[in-house]
Amino acid sequence: MKEVNNKDFVITVVGVGYVGQPLINEFAKAKKVFAYDIDNEKIQALGNNNKNGNIVYTNNSECIGESDAVIVAVPTPIYDNNKPNLEFVINACKTIGHNLRKNTLIVFESSYYPGVTEDICIPLLEENSSLKNNIDFFVGYSPERINPSDKIHTINTITKVISAQNNFVLDQVERL
């Protein structure tokens, strides 16, 4: 896995919403960032107004294969019965898996219940990529803590909770 501190380290953020966009803006201060979303109108509008040369707004999932890290920041809405809707996370994992290359770091920012990463996300990534977790690609988790209306506790001031499958990956997630 390429070190996060490498100047050529490329990041894709999957999901350009209230969680993804602040991450994109922060990462783009020092890295090339692909901002990937399936909403064509959103991508076109953001791309037309983009003045940061480090950000590429796209709906082409092939950008994932050009990335050293993929940050998953898709929504996890709640059904009327208070159960989480994991459809966006599942679809993101399939898309990432289809485009995943070896030695990629994947960090899940989407909020969901314990066990989803291990029981749903990793198997989908392996199935759709034919790669093996913790050998060919690496996974971390850092639940989003962004409250869009809070101007005091912003992405730059909140303490992030992070986890990973081993100390090396944890170190890379922390540097990210």
Residue ranges and their predicted role:
Residues 50-56, 133-137:
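A short helix-to-beta-strand connector/capping loop
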Residues 4-7, 123-140, 146-176:
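Internal alpha-helical scaffold of NAD(P)-dependent oxidoreductase catalytic cores
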Residues 74-76, 111, 166:
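Short glycine-/small-residue-rich Rossmann-like dinucleotide-binding loops
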Residues 70-71:
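N-terminal Rossmann-like NAD(P) cofactor-binding module of classical short-chain dehydrogenase/reductase
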Residues 26-29, 48-51, 84-88, 120-123, ...:
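Short, glycine/charged-enriched secondary-structure capping and boundary segments
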Residues 78-145:
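Rossmann-like NAD(P)(H) cofactor-binding subdomain of soluble oxidoreductases
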Residues 1-49, 56-65:
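NAD(P)+-binding Rossmann beta1-loop-alpha1 motif at the extreme N-terminus of oxidoreductases
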Residues 65-66, 102, 157:
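Alpha-helix C-terminal capping/helix-to-coil transition sites in glycosyltransferase folds
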